[in-house]
């Protein structure tokens, strides 16, 4: 049982080392060696505890009924396995993160297309040293001064200066 559960939770040490900062490599190596030691110890354990030879203890224990009492208590002992409350939450968060990533990728691709259009516009415009103020206002409408709304120089709101 321990071996089967461990197979699901392996660490990709190569990619882990690639993202690790240089000053934390020693800590990462210590973690890797501790993890390997832990895995080998856990793999050496059997799924079920070893069987107890109750006849041997009955023959060697002087007090009558003591071994039977221990046997009954041992057989009645049930160690509860904690229920897994967090895997479902983590899976739900993972699905939500996948959706968020897909939305981000879609939005990023839209921004890239918009930026490519702007880049094409900039590549096709007249060079700045040959451009008049009217050409500049035509290419970049946000640079046009609004003399009707702001009749006094600088012909734009103070906040934009």
From Swiss-Prot:
Compartments in which it is found: Mitochondrion; Mitochondrion inner membrane
Transport listed as a keyword: yes
GO biological process: cellular response to peptide; proton motive force-driven ATP synthesis; proton motive force-driven mitochondrial ATP synthesis
Lineage: Eukaryota, Metazoa, Chordata, Craniata, Vertebrata
Gene Ontology annotations for the cellular component aspect, listed alphabetically: mitochondrial inner membrane; mitochondrion; proton-transporting ATP synthase complex
Disulfide bridges in this chain: none
Family: Belongs to the ATPase d subunit family.
Described function: Subunit d, of the mitochondrial membrane ATP synthase complex (F(1)F(0) ATP synthase or Complex V) that produces ATP from ADP in the presence of a proton gradient across the membrane which is generated by electron transport complexes of the respiratory chain. ATP synthase complex consist of a soluble F(1) head domain - the catalytic core - and a membrane F(1) domain - the membrane proton channel. These two domains are linked by a central stalk rotating inside the F(1) region and a stationary peripheral stalk.
Molecular function (Gene Ontology), one example: protein-containing complex binding
Tagged with keyword Oxidoreductase: no
InterPro entries given in the database record: ATP_synth_F0_dsu_mt, ATP_synth_F0_dsu_sf_mt
Sites of N6-succinyllysine modification: 78, 85, 95, 144, 149
Record keywords, A-Z: Acetylation, CF(0), Hydrogen ion transport, Ion transport, Membrane, Mitochondrion, Mitochondrion inner membrane, Transport
Residue numbers of N-acetylalanine PTMs: 2
Top-level taxon of the source organism: Eukaryota
Organism: Rattus norvegicus
Modified residues (N6-acetyllysine): 32, 48, 63, 78, 85, 95, 117, 144, 149
Name assigned to this protein: ATP synthase peripheral stalk subunit d, mitochondrial
Quaternary structure note: Component of the ATP synthase complex composed at least of ATP5F1A/subunit alpha, ATP5F1B/subunit beta, ATP5MC1/subunit c (homooctomer), MT-ATP6/subunit a, MT-ATP8/subunit 8, ATP5ME/subunit e, ATP5MF/subunit f, ATP5MG/subunit g, ATP5MK/subunit k, ATP5MJ/subunit j, ATP5F1C/subunit gamma, ATP5F1D/subunit delta, ATP5F1E/subunit epsilon, ATP5PF/subunit F6, ATP5PB/subunit b, ATP5PD/subunit d, ATP5PO/subunit OSCP.
């Amino acid at each position: 049982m321990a071996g089967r559960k461990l197979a699901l939770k392996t660490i990709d040490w190569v990619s882990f080392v690639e993202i690790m900062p240089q000053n934390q490599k020693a800590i990462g190596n210590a973690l890797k060696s501790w993890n390997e030691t832990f895995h080998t110890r856990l793999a050496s354990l059997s799924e079920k505890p070893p069987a107890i030879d109750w006849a041997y203890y009955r023959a060697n224990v002087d007090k009558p009924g003591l071994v039977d009492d221990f046997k009954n208590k041992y057989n009645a002992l049930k160690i509860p396995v904690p229920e897994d409350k967090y895997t479902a939450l983590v899976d739900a968060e993972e699905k939500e993160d996948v959706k968020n990533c897909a939305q981000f990728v879609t939005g990023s691709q839209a921004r890239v297309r918009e930026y490519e259009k702007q880049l094409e516009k900039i590549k096709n415009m007249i060079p700045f040293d040959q451009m008049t103020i009217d050409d500049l206002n035509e290419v970049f409408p946000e640079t046009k001064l609004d003399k009707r709304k702001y009749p006094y120089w600088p012909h734009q709101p103070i906040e934009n200066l």
